[in-house]
């Protein structure tokens, strides 16, 4: 069986460091590993419309932002197939068929759905498209026969429900769909990067993000205003590492080489943490180090983005070609699904032959 990856993002804004450590960086590594036969990267505009139906222009304008972020991070259209979800109509048809295999109560029990409903204040009035997201996500995954889906830990319940739908379909209609495996970030600090304000999640809507396309000045300003330990008032005071955003970001981004380059007084992050805990180390010094670490990571991303920004028609051509290739794959899967469900009437020559013989006998 071919090893195939499917992953993607909603085009509701520019991508940020949470996306980078949660999935983007790993995607590039997987792309360049040579371990996978195909990699599909989806710009999930149709899914974004489930809670932005009254603001399609927001989604429309952010297609290019996400594409630029993808390319600037190192996703290579020669190795990874980047496509736009809404331009693959087979996904909608697959979703429609899968809906018959899922109960409303099962959707209501999905922890990710419940959390997202609360976060978006949908408790009183949930859009059906948003509520059925686990089903449409299953269509996305199975259309491309994905064996591996790299996501953050918050998406685990969604992947488990996708696996349930696949098993249900195969038990009813015969082995047709591929059951995907989840691939979580291997750095535990990357599982969910907090916002710069200390909130549990970096979120575009909360305004607590450091964007991949931020200027050096913007990054520095955001780092220097980061939430730390509110009780660490004086330099000599002992400080807390737990819940301290600056150290969480250092867990995710810093390397021993960074210490040698930017903070040679310490050999590694453990030494820095120990000094902070016992007191005598100020937040400003730690933040300046984090700023240097992030600028080093983001500078090559910024440079690549600026190059792609010079040829926007070329970026759209990358998306057009990727979408055309994705269309062909999804069309083949849809044919297999319809054959398994016995609704491929015009392609079933045997059905037509048998019924022709049946009724020719009656007419005689």
Stretches found by the model and what they are:
Residues 2-139, 257, 296-298, 306:
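N-terminal Rossmann-like or analogous alpha/beta NTP/dinucleotide-binding catalytic cores
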Residues 113-115, 119-169, 173, 194-197:
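Internal, conserved structured core segments that host functional sites
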Residues 92-96, 133-136, 156-159, 243-247, ...:
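Non-catalytic, well-ordered alpha-helical scaffold segments
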Residues 23-30, 162-165, 249:
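Buried hydrophobic packing segments
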Residues 163-364:
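Conserved nucleotide- and phosphate/pyrophosphate-binding catalytic cores
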């Amino acid at each position: 069986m071919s090893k195939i990856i499917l992953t993607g993002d909603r085009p509701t804004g520019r991508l940020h460091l949470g996306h980078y450590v949660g999935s983007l960086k790993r995607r590039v590594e997987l792309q360049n590993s040579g371990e996978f036969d195909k990699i599909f990267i989806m710009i999930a505009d149709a899914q974004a419309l489930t809670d932005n139906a009254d603001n399609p222009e927001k989604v429309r304008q952010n297609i290019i932002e996400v594409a630029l972020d993808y390319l600037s991070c190192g996703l290579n259209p020669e190795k990874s197939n980047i496509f736009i979800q809404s331009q693959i109509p087979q996904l909608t048809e697959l979703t429609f068929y899968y809906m018959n295999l899922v109960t409303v109560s099962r959707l209501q029990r999905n922890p990710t759905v419940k959390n997202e409903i609360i976060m978006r204040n949908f408790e009183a009035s949930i859009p059906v498209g948003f509520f059925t997201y686990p089903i449409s996500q299953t269509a996305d995954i199975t259309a491309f026969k994905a064996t591996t889906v790299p996501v953050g830990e918050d998406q685990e319940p969604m992947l488990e429900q996708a696996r349930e739908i696949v098993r249900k379909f195969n038990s009813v209609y015969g082995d047709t769909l591929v059951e995907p495996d989840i691939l979580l970030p291997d750095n535990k600090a990357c599982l969910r990067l907090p916002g710069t304000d200390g909130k549990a999640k970096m979120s575009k809507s909360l305004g607590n993000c450091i964007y991949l396309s931020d200027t050096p000045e913007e990054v520095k300003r955001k780092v220097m205003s980061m939430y730390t330990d509110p009780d660490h008032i004086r330099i000599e005071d002992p400080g807390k590492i737990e819940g301290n955003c600056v150290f969480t970001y250092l867990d995710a981004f810093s390397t021993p080489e960074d210490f040698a380059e930017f903070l040679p007084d310490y050999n590694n992050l453990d030494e820095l943490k120990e000094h902070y805990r016992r007191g005598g180390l100020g937040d400003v010094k730690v933040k300046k180090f984090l700023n240097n670490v992030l600028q080093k990571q983001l500078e090559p991303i910024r440079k690549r983005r600026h190059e792609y920004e010079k040829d926007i028609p070329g970026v759209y051509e990358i998306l057009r070609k990727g979408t055309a290739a994705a269309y062909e794959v999804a069309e083949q899967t849809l044919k297999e699904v319809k054959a398994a469900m016995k609704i491929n009437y015009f392609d079933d020559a045997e059905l037509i032959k048998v019924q022709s013989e049946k009724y020719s006998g009656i007419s005689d």
